[in-house]
Amino acid sequence: MLASRLPDVITLGCRLNLAESETIRSLAGSRDMVVINGCGVTNEAVRQTRVAVRRARRDRPNAEIVVTGCASEMDRNAFAAMPEVDRIIPNAAKLLPATWGGFPNHQPPRRHARAFVGVQNGCDHACTFCAIPQGRGASRSEPIGAVVTRIAALVEDGTNEVVLTGVDLTSYAGGLGALVEAILIGVPGLPRLRLSSLDTIEIDGRLFDLVTGEPRVLPHLHLSLQAGDDLILKRMKRRHLRQDAVTMIERLKAKRDIAIGADLIAGFPTESEAAFANTLALLDDCDIVHAHVFPFSPRAGTPAARMPQLRPEIVKERAARLRAAAAARKTAWLKTLLGSTQQIVVEKPGDRGHAPNFAEVHLPSIHPELVEPPSFSSPSERKGIASTGSARMGDTSSAPTVGSVITTTITAATDDHLMGTIA
């Protein structure tokens, strides 16, 4: 059940949405409101946004239900027709104070394991399967100075990990490498900087050197690969070929042990079994250990929706095979981390976190009810709280707080996560 009489922001979709939801939360004031920040990347994401709207109305019958994000941007009429929806806010207006009436936010600051910072929005490319440019518009970037100032304030308030987000992050104006370098120089107290989804074809020399040589840039990259077959990549209107991705990842991993994640689409129109096999083989050829697999979803208005479609059962079956192969690779990779020492940022409820390589680590001897983060009423109360922890099991007075960085020793591996003890 959602809390009553306070704004609640429900987020679906990408990390940029997560970053934007925090801004919305700070602008929404203290009204009886539920904001659904929806996703339109697939038909299923749009369906889930509608489900969230209906659930919000059921749980908060007297609240104002506000919908924003790509789902309502791309299908405004359908959301406007929903009786549960009171207001729709365009993406272009959702971060403007005037949109929310200029109400001050009286909610206590929320503690997060990491801060998502949106630095780029929109996309100038035309991938045939993607409807996101319809919802986000042309590419635009936040000024470097504004980004550095924002991150410096987060670190001052105790943030230990910042994740840079964007629709097409590597198209950041002036170069993503220049931005990363400015952050590292301008915010020397930032311990961990993580990059969200990157396009391999846009990783230039400056960014390559920072990713492979700067310890504060975490050794985990999520890449927008989509497919492993050249003909399918061309029909997707991607800007790279299979070998481009393989070569870039080989170069990266030759310099540093970087965990590779990737977005992959199964069942794209005209995909043959041989073409799918090339995508399946990409898991091994690119050493992918964090895979996001999507069954192809035809989005209205995109060129791919007009191409010859595969039967739904074939799309579903190929996505299942790709997910199973990806899961097996991840399990094998996790086993290689047994006995290692990993620094994790503690996440809610307080008994888990993610290592620099984005492996999830659970601490089975920590009791979550003992490690809930405190509420803060001022920045001075927040300062220093998220510093590296040194808690011992059973010592509740020094249990790690959400957002703190602790050192763990990995003692076991399951199919999808690690288990450890505090070192």
Where are these regions (language model features)?
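Flexible, low-complexity linker/hinge segments
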Residues: G101-H112
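Conserved, mostly hydrophobic/aromatic
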Residues: V147, L164, L195, L223, ...
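A structural motif corresponding to the C-terminal lobe/cap of the Radical SAM core domain
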Residues: P219, K234-E347, D351
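Cofactor-cradling patches in redox/metallo enzymes
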Residues: M1-L96
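Canonical Radical SAM [4Fe-4S] cluster-binding loop centered on the CxxxCxxC motif
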Residues: H112-G145
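Conserved SAM/AdoMet-binding glycine-rich loop
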Residues: I65-G69, M74-D75, E156-A274
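Conserved alpha-helical substructure of the radical SAM core
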Residues: R136-V163
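Terminal RNA-binding accessory module
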Residues: P298, A305-L370, I385-G389, S397-A423
